[in-house]
């Protein structure tokens, strides 16, 4: 399965969002949906949360809800894939500047943290490797750049940060969605 062939395109999703007057970019919407999934969302309740957070609780018309359902499904599948197929939805192409990509990454991370926080209200209490990754994501969301920075150097740095964010999202998904042992599984074996 080719992820690119099944993902709605960045441009088509941006257009659908704009047509419905939703004030999010495709990157931000993907970040939000990814955050909900990585936080443990497993049912259709994700749609209500998206409506509440982006459209004053009003459901989207089919012209937007269908691409979002497709985006949700593909994102869920890639997060659950053992081959780490998950990718961030970012603008690409010759006409997209490194500054546009940096802004999109910041928006993606901010909305990822929003979605994650909606599903994991005690996010600030998470420790160890996952807690460090979440702290790093908070810092990445606030990163800025100077317009006169070397674009080639910034592009290289951005690629590294995108890869880190991708792996941090996968780590969060693993942490918050893995099956927790039930009480009988925790019980010590009984000697007879």
UniProtKB/Swiss-Prot annotation:
Cellular component annotations (GO), alphabetically ordered: cytosol
Domain of life assignment: Bacteria
InterPro entries (alphabetical): YgfB-like, YgfB-like_sf
Similarity remark: Belongs to the UPF0149 family.
Protein name: UPF0149 protein Spro_3920
């Amino acid at each position: 399965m080719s992820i690119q062939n099944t993902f709605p395109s960045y441009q088509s999703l941006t257009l659908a969002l704009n047509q419905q007057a939703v004030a999010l970019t495709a990157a931000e919407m993907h970040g939000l949906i990814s955050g909900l999934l990585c936080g443990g969302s497993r049912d259709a309740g994700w749609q209500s949360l998206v409506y509440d957070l982006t459209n004053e609780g009003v459901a989207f018309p089919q012209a937007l809800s269908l691409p979002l359902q497709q985006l949700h499904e593909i994102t869920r599948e890639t997060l659950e894939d053992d081959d780490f197929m998950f990718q961030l939805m970012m603008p690409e192409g010759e006409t997209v500047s490194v500054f546009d990509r940096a802004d999109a990454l910041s928006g993606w991370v901010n909305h990822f943290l929003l979605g994650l926080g909606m599903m994991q209200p005690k996010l600030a209490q998470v420790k160890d490797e996952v807690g460090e990754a979440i702290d790093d994501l908070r810092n990445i969301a606030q990163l800025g750049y100077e317009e006169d920075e070397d674009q080639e150097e910034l592009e290289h740095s951005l690629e590294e940060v995108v890869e880190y964010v991708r792996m941090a999202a996968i780590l969060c998904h693993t942490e918050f969605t893995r099956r927790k042992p039930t009480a009988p599984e925790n019980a010590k074996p009984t000697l007879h």
